[in-house]
From Swiss-Prot:
Residues 192-221 have a biased composition (Low complexity). PROSITE patterns: HMG_BOX_2. Residues 283-315 are annotated as: Required for transcriptional activation activity and synergistic coactivation of transcriptional activity with POU3F2. It comes from Homo sapiens (Human). Residues 40-108 bind DNA. This is Transcription factor SOX-12. Residues 149-159 have a biased composition (Gly residues). Residues 1-40, 100-288 are annotated as: Disordered.
Length: 315
């Protein structure tokens, strides 16, 4: 009977019907779709029915071929088949599906959940010497501080800092501000001689043992240098006094150029109330440019009631 069907298929020109493969042979057994562990497999589709027979052919021809390569070739060949050539395998897959439903009515497809892999480990941070620490750039140092530390380090060793460090720091800050904004008159009053002397002392090293050692190592200054320093200090003090006097004269000249106030402005009424006077002794009503005649009349009038009886309401 099988031979007759094969001959009829050859006459029709279609592919030969699938022979009794392992699927049909296993379907005759009672546990044909069960694994030894008790898991029920899904029924095969048309491609799986066709690929079983074709896979055996390929394995016979190329026994060393990898399973992944065999599956790739089978997929390409299945896509090249026409729909008429797939009909016998589709029918066989439908028969197996109905048999599977009859043998395992309570079967429900439960796909295996993919196990979530371990969370990605955090990227290890490089050591501080070669990692982010190298990207940090040191801030700009003020001129004078770095030199003082560099010069005082080898001479003083581990000696304590002098007590007048705060004063030296203030002088250095004033010097830096003078360099950045030379247009400010106030910052030009820095004693240049004192600052120069402080820098010279810092260059020699801190007080204590380091200073004594430095003084012993260096030659004693001559007597001619002391008068020169005193002359520099005196010249700097005279320049500061001249600048102070000049700034005072400018302020007095500015006040002298102000226009005189009108004679009609009378603020005697405001003087009677001490609460209206600001703590600095001046009043915002003393600027005549912003007072009109109407405002002057209002200010000159008596604001307070003449007696307490005016504050009592009678019905």
């Amino acid at each position: 009977m099988v031979q007759q069907r094969g001959a009829r298929a050859k006459r029709d020109g279609g592919p030969p019907p699938p022979g009794p493969g392992p699927a049909e042979e296993g379907a005759r057994e009672p546990g044909w779709c069960k694994t030894p562990s008790g898991h029920i497999k899904r029924p095969m589709n048309a491609f799986m029915v066709w690929s079983q027979h074709e896979r055996r052919k390929i394995m016979d021809q190329w026994p060393d071929m990898h399973n992944a390569e065999i599956s790739k070739r089978l997929g390409r060949r299945w896509q090249l088949l026409q729909d008429s050539e797939k009909i016998p395998f589709v029918r066989e897959a439908e028969r197996l599906r109905l048999k599977h439903m009859a043998d395992y009515p309570d079967y429900k497809y439960r796909p295996r959940k993919k196990s979530k892999g371990a969370p990605a480990k955090a990227r290890p941070r490089p050591p501080g010497g070669s990692g982010g620490g190298s990207r940090l750039k040191p801030g700009p140092q003020l001129p004078g501080r770095g030199g003082r530390r560099a010069a005082g380090g080898p001479l003083g060793g581990g000696a304590a800092a002098p007590e007048d460090d705060d004063e030296d720091d203030d002088e250095e800050l004033l010097e830096v501000r003078l360099v950045e904004t030379p247009g400010r008159e106030l910052w030009r009053m820095v004693p240049a001689g004192r600052a120069a002397r402080g820098q010279a002392e810092r260059a020699q090293g801190p007080s204590g043992e380091g200073a004594a050692a430095a003084a012993a190592a260096s030659p004693t200054p001559s007597e001619d240098e002391e008068p020169e320093e005193e002359e520099e200090e005196a010249a700097a003090a005279e320049e500061g006094e001249e600048e102070t006097v000049a700034s005072g004269e400018e302020s007095l000249g500015f006040l002298s150029r102000l226009p005189p106030g009108p004679a009609g402005l009378d603020c005697s009424a405001l003087d009677r109330d001490p609460d209206l006077q600001p703590p600095s002794g001046t009043s915002h009503f003393e600027f005549p440019d912003y007072c009109t005649p109407e405002v002057t009349e209002m200010i000159a009038g008596d604001w307070r009631p003449s007696s307490i009886a005016d504050l009592v309401f009678t019905y």
